[in-house]
């Protein structure tokens, strides 16, 4: 049987740079990698099924968008392969309604929200003008289980009619009706941050919600602006979800409260800034990959002891 340290399945063309960096950094440490794409998924699935091929770790950036990768995911879940972001934990973590309640229980600040059931379960919900007045206007409408890139999210809603219309659009999904959170300004910058949890370590960056541009957050800035709580909040979310790798968005508002506004994104957009103006700073991408490398080395070492 051929055994590789890490297999990565992906279908999005813009993942290529991220995957290339992973291969380069891991192979420099004599860690073997295996890439799975649409052209070889059937062959790989067959070889894994027949136990001719095996992986110690698996990153799946494909089966959520391409059913051809689902069988391999099922097989590897039954083997000793360590799945980066266990599927069961992902399903729990991407449910915004569940995360909203669990974050509150963990002491995290979240936007005031109203959770409403799927249209397929309850056609009519009782929402009043008074409910909207508490939310404020505009407010945000979010499907609870539709994830990635703001899909299905309405950020400038004003009326009950918009809520009712959106419920029909995704009739099997719960919805969060959420107050809009506004960041304070820190020396001319919006205090909006995207934070990664990357294999045991938090990484925080500036992220402008209007321009979608990243900037590295320096240690001096973190100290001067009192932003170390970003790392603590991200660590708390990691404990709640049990995921290995995800991103979240946290806002510092004008009451000096850190508010988690976009709960968990398990499929992080890892386009690099040197090639994409709205990409993740290259240094941060390298840091995340080095965290992955160290996680694999540490886990292999522990398994060899056991």
State what each model feature region is.
Residues 103-104, 129-151, 172-187:
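ATP-grasp fold ATP-binding core
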Residues 2-9:
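Extreme N-terminal starter segment of soluble prokaryotic enzymes
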Residues 252-306:
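C-terminal active-site "lid" helix and adjoining low-complexity regulatory extension at the edge
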Residues 139, 176, 203-204, 246, ...:
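Protein kinase-like catalytic core scaffold
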Residues 243-255:
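A short glycine-rich, hydrophobically flanked beta-strand micro-motif that places a catalytic Asp/Glu
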Residues 153-241:
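Phosphate-binding site of ATP-dependent enzymes
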Residues 112, 139-165:
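Glycine-rich phosphate-binding loop of ATP-grasp-fold ATP-dependent ligases
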Residues 11-122, 127:
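Conserved N-proximal alpha/beta basic substrate-recognition cap immediately N-terminal to
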């Amino acid at each position: 049987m051929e055994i590789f340290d890490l297999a990565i399945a992906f279908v999005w063309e813009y993942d290529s740079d991220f995957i290339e960096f992973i291969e380069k950094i891991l192979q420099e440490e004599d860690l073997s990698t295996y890439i799975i794409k649409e052209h070889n998924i059937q062959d790989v699935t067959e070889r894994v099924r027949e136990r001719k091929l095996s992986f110690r770790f698996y990153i799946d950036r494909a089966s959520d968008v391409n059913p051809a990768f689902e069988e391999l995911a099922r097989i590897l879940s039954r083997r000793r392969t360590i799945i980066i972001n266990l599927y069961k934990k992902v399903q729990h973590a991407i449910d915004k309604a569940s995360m909203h309640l669990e974050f509150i229980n963990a002491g995290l600040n979240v936007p005031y929200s109203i959770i409403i059931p799927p249209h397929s379960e309850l056609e009519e919900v009782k929402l009043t003008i008074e409910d909207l007045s508490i939310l404020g206007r505009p407010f945000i409408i979010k499907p609870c289980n539709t994830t990635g890139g703001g899909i299905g999210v309405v950020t400038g809603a004003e009326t009950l009619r918009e809520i009712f219309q959106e419920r029909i659009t995704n009739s099997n999904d719960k919805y969060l009706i959420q107050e809009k959170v506004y960041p304070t300004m820190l020396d001319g910058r919006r205090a909006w941050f995207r934070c990664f949890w990357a294999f045991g370590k938090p990484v925080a960056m500036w992220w402008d919600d209007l321009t979608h541009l990243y900037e590295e957050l320096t240690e001096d800035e973190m100290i001067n602006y009192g932003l170390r709580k970003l790392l603590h909040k991200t660590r708390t979310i990691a404990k709640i979800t049990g995921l290995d790798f995800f991103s979240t968005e946290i806002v510092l508002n004008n009451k000096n409260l850190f508010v988690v506004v976009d709960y968990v994104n398990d499929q992080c957009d890892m386009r690099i800034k040197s090639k994409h103006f709205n990409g993740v700073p290259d240094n941060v991408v390298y840091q995340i990959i080095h965290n992955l490398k160290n996680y694999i080395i540490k886990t292999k070492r522990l398994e060899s002891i056991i």
